[in-house]
Regions:
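ATP-dependent carboxylate activation and anion-phosphoryl transfer catalytic cores
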Residues: 115-120, 249-333
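Phosphate-binding site of ATP-dependent enzymes
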Residues: 166-260, 283-288
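Active-site nucleotide/adenylate-binding loops and adjacent lid/helix of ATP-dependent enzymes
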Residues: 2-10, 27, 59-61, 104-185, ...
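Alpha-helix N-cap recognition
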Residues: 51, 164-165, 314
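Short acidic, glycine/proline-rich loop/turn micro-motifs
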Residues: 17-20, 155-158, 302-304
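ATP-binding N-terminal substructure of ATP-dependent carboxylate-amine bond-forming enzymes
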Residues: 1-96, 100-101, 105-107, 111, ...
């Protein structure tokens, strides 16, 4: 590959989303990626997308062969992530990762489920409600998970997200409506193992070996869910007791089902270059897709990168492969 001038766009370091995943790390993912690209001979510079009008002007004047897009929203609004990608398109910028259509489909968890149902990918039964209006509903049994329909990174999903009664459900809905101005997703709770599968590629996409978040040692009485406490609150017992591992006891038919669901979902949701899919595997080996994550975290300890390593790739090789995939997409137009 020719040496490129690459703009690394990212949310500000002071952003809580960035600070959460920096816990215990010396560098941000933007810094790690810049080092990889520079060692490969590329020139890099950073562009902070912080929601201020001047950052839009800065993007409009960017002189780069490619944008390595790490932006997670616009200002403090996660739901504006697709808008940033759309702005790149308007400016004619070439960039890594999913475009506005794929980002929008994956961000709306209810819409994701409807699309995947058409493609026969199993997801938990669900309902959506917004300020008293029921928009969609299956017949769901308790317990249920109650979460924002358009947030990611476990935002809005604490241990209290698990509701076992009408009273708990209504209290949880009220809390989320107070915090987020969009519908609430009520989802059948799937008791089982938490499995993450990365996908890399485009027309010839590849699924990585699965990575498991072992929740079996959470404090007694806490629900076995990947809550914000488990993922981000570093000083808590819940955070310390949840460990990532490579499962070696999944049956071949389960591995095949996970791989098929991940690759089918990647194409159905029109994702590009790389993504991560979150699954639940029940004790009777049923596979449920819980969430699609386009443009997942790429720091060296992230779930996606762990899966890449299990596939035989190093962290630098994975970053450079994502870069090459984006380059190839634009060359083939």
């Amino acid at each position: 590959m020719a040496r490129l001038r690459i703009a690394i766009t990212h949310s500000p370091d002071g952003d809580p989303r960035v600070q959460r995943r920096r816990a215990g790390l010396r560098k941000t993912d933007a810094q790690e990626i810049a080092e990889v690209l520079r060692r490969a001979g590329h020139k890099t510079f950073f562009v902070v997308v912080d929601g201020a009008p001047k950052c839009l002007k800065r993007l409009a004047s960017v002189d780069a062969d490619l944008v390595f897009n790490l932006v997670e929203g616009f200002g403090d609004d996660n739901t504006k992530e697709p808008h940033v990608a759309a702005y790149y398109d308007l400016l004619g910028l070439r960039y890594t990762g999913s475009g506005p259509r794929g980002l929008s489909l994956a961000m709306d968890k209810a819409l994701t489920k409807k699309v995947l149902a058409f493609h026969r990918v199993r997801t938990p039964k669900f309902a959506t409600v917004f300020r008293g209006r029921l928009d969609w509903a299956h017949d769901i049994d308790f317990p249920v998970i109650v979460k924002p329909v358009r947030e990611d990174g476990s935002i809005g999903i604490g241990f209290s997200a698990l509701a076992g009664s009408i009273k708990e459900l209504m209290e949880r809905i009220d809390e989320l409506h107070a915090d987020f101005n969009h519908p609430v997703l009520i989802e059948q709770y799937i008791d089982g193992r938490e499995i993450y599968v990365g996908v890399i590629g485009n027309a010839r996409a590849e699924a990585f070996p699965p990575v498991e978040l072992d929740l079996s040692h959470l404090p007694k009485g806490k629900p076995r869910i990947a809550s914000v406490e488990v993922k981000w609150e570093e000083g808590t017992r819940a955070y310390r007791s949840a460990k990532l591992r490579f499962p070696d006891d999944l049956r071949r038919e389960v591995l095949d089902a996970i791989r098929h669901a991940a690759l089918t979902s990647f194409q159905a949701l029109q994702l590009r270059d790389y993504a991560r899919f979150d699954f639940r595997i029940t004790p009777d080996n049923k596979v449920y897709l819980i969430e699609a994550n386009p443009n997942p975290y790429l720091y060296s300890g992230a779930e996606f990168i762990r899966g890449a390593r299990a596939s035989g790739r190093t962290h630098p090789e994975t970053i450079l492969e994502i870069l090459e995939l984006a380059e190839e997409r634009y060359r083939s137009r």
